[in-house]
Amino acid sequence: MIKLKKSIALSESGFIFDPTTGDSYSVNQTGSKIIEYLKEGLSEDQIIDKLNDTFDSDKELMQKDLDDFLQHLKQLKMIENV
């Protein structure tokens, strides 16, 4: 299971803010949805299902994009594997 740091804030326009570091980032609509789903506590499989419901895309491509995005968030120390 992947856990987003509780302190992470997401604006409606797609800005992510980490108040512990003061860092902020801009994400696209897909990234914004992923952050939203992580905040809800959804699993990777649930996130993929929701993304496929929202965006008409190949499930394998969506999985790769999710994996890449989660790896990036991990490098930024915004998520942790539980």
Report each predicted region and the residues it spans:
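Acidic, low-complexity/disordered tracts enriched in E/D and polar residues
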Residues: 1-32, 36-39, 82
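Long, charge-rich, low-complexity alpha-helical segments
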Residues: 26-82
